[in-house]
């Protein structure tokens, strides 16, 4: 008696290898700097999951976790050995236990809620008064399907982007060439120009790409950046 084949269906996004490599580098950066409790498993550590190159497990508190599976060699019968894809699923830890497929926008929203800061309720008031407020570190988390951004969020995001652009212009044009005869003075001026100045209208902060699922799935080729400091 021949055994009947059983198939497991997954929703996947076909992506190039270099995009996976870029996303993995971004994840390693945040796991190292933020001490994120994300788990990385190689293919030999995953059982009953053929064609799985690696897996990232992202805990979401006591409720559940997100599993990001990276696949390779999906169509060996056609000789497409360099075919890569990724699948995202949510696993519940509560009774009744279940798992379900996630789209990148929903996954980004869940990750944003648990791991990255966002605008607070008092951000609008602080922005109007010229006070510092916490920036949104994960803009991709607000692109959930069917979700219409509020006017307050759009205003704060525009203000945040304006501060970032003004900061970039200040960095490029703030230090002038003082000539070869004043090289020591010029170097000293450059060192002081790079520092964070109290009372300045410009906010300087380090930026780093965030581990967005939309970026990994190829939906957003442009990297989304995080702002590690607070703005005005």
Curated annotation (Swiss-Prot):
Membrane topology term: Peripheral membrane protein
Coiled-coil blocks: none
| Main subcellular location | host cell
Has keyword Membrane? yes
Q: Name one GO cellular component term.
A: host cell plasma membrane
Q: Where is this motif: BC-box-like motif?
A: 150-159
Query: Where is this gene product found?
Result: Host cytoplasm; Host cell membrane; Virion
Endpoints of the signal sequence: none
Which modifications occur after translation, per UniProt? Processed in virion by the viral protease.
- Assigned keywords, A-Z: Host cell membrane, Host cytoplasm, Host membrane, Host-virus interaction, Membrane, Phosphoprotein, Ubl conjugation, Ubl conjugation pathway, Virion
Q: Which residues carry this modification: Phosphothreonine?
A: 100
Can you supply a Gene Ontology BP term from the record?
Answer: viral life cycle
Q: Where does the record place the region Multimerization?
A: 157-169
Name the domain of life: Viruses
Annotated positions of the Phosphoserine modification: 150
* Motif HCCH motif in this chain: 112-142
Up-regulation conditions: Expressed late during infection in a Rev-dependent manner.
Described by its record, this protein's role is as follows:
Counteracts the innate antiviral activity of APOBEC3G. Forms a complex with host APOBEC3G thus preventing the entry of this lethally hypermutating enzyme into progeny virions. Functions as an adapter molecule, recruiting APOBEC3G to the ubiquitin-proteasome machinery. Targets APOBEC3G for degradation through the assembly with elongin BC complex, CUL5 and RBX1. Binds viral RNA and affects the stability of viral nucleoprotein core. May play a role in viral morphology.
The domain-related comment in the record is: The BC-like-box motif mediates the interaction with elongin BC complex.
User: How does the annotation summarize its subunit structure?
Assistant: Homomultimer; in vitro and presumably in vivo. Interacts with viral Pr55Gag precursor and host APOBEC3G. The interaction between Vif and APOBEC3G is species-specific, which may play a role in restricting the replication of SIV to their host. Forms an E3 ligase complex by interacting with host CUL5 and elongin BC complex (ELOB and ELOC).
Other remarks?
Vif-defective viruses show catastrophic failure in reverse transcription due to APOBEC-induced mutations that initiate a DNA base repair pathway and compromise the structural integrity of the ssDNA. In the absence of Vif, the virion is morphologically abnormal.
Similarity annotation: Belongs to the primate lentivirus group Vif protein family.
Q: What is this protein called?
A: Virion infectivity factor
Origin species, per record, is Simian immunodeficiency virus agm.vervet (isolate AGM3) (SIV-agm.ver)
Gene that codes for this?
Answer: vif
């Amino acid at each position: 008696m021949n055994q009947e084949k059983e198939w497991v269906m997954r929703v996947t996004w076909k992506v190039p290898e270099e995009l996976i490599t870029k996303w993995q580098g971004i994840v390693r950066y945040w796991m190292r700097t933020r001490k994120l409790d994300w788990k990385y498993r190689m293919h030999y550590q995953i059982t009953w999951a053929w064609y799985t190159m690696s897996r990232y497990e992202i805990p979401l508190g006591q409720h559940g976790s997100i599993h990001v599976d990276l696949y390779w060699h999906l169509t060996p019968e056609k000789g497409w050995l360099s075919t890569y894809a990724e699948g995202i699923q949510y696993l519940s830890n509560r009774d009744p236990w279940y798992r379900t497929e996630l789209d990148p926008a929903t996954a980004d929203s869940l990750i944003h809620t648990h791991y990255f800061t966002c605008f607070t309720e008092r951000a609008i008031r602080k922005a109007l008064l010229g006070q510092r407020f916490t920036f949104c570190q994960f803009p991709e988390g607000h692109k959930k399907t069917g979700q219409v951004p509020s006017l307050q969020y759009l205003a704060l995001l525009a203000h945040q982007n304006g501060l970032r652009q003004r900061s970039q212009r200040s960095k490029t044009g703030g230090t002038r060439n003082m000539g070869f005869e004043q090289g020591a003075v010029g170097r000293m001026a450059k060192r002081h120009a790079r520092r964070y100045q109290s009372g300045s209208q410009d906010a300087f902060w380090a930026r780093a790409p965030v581990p967005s699922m939309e970026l990994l799935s190829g939906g957003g080729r442009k990297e989304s950046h995080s702002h590690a400091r607070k703005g005005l």
